[in-house]
């Protein structure tokens, strides 16, 4: 079963802290990594889905459109490539900002889990590479 290394987790923490100007803590529960800022304004959940995919969700950043998600996706893609994983699943996209990010980044909506709500195509998105 794949797991993120301490170094990989720290890279994600460093990215969030520098882009969001915050201090983060990490918790690890059942091979799932939760990164949250002390003020509760920033959050990210990351876990491998077996050897099939890396899943991230619970994306919330106080400062939007400053490159945080682009840097996170780049780091996660590199981690996946190092482990022979070729799919990232962005789970529970709910906001126009995340929908826009997914489309801009080449992610495809999962036809089995997405639906339009208030003009936003919500649900899961796949990033295959």
Predicted regions: what they are:
Residues 114-129:
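C-terminal "cap" of GNAT-fold acetyltransferases
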Residues 65-78:
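Conserved acetyl-CoA-binding loop-helix of GNAT-fold acetyltransferases
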Residues 32, 36-53, 57-58:
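A conserved beta-strand-loop-helix scaffold within acyl/acetyltransferase catalytic domains
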Residues 57-66:
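A short, internal acetyl-CoA/4′-phosphopantetheine-binding micro-motif in the GNAT/acyltransferase core
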Residues 1-32:
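Short amphipathic alpha-helix that is part of the acyltransferase structural core
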């Amino acid at each position: 079963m794949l797991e993120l290394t301490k170094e990989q987790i720290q890279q994600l923490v460093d990215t969030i802290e520098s882009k969001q100007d915050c201090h983060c803590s990490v918790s690890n529960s059942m091979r799932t990594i939760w990164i949250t800022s002390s003020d509760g304004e920033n959050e990210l959940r990351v876990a491998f889905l077996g050897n099939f995919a890396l899943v991230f969700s619970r994306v919330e950043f106080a400062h939007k459109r400053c490159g945080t998600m682009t840097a996170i996706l780049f780091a996660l893609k590199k981690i996946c490539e190092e482990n022979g994983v070729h799919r990232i699943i962005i789970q529970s996209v709910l906001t126009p900002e995340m929908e826009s990010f997914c489309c801009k980044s080449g992610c495809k909506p999962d036809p089995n889990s997405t639906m339009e709500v208030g003009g936003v195509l919500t649900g899961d998105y796949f990033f295959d590479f």
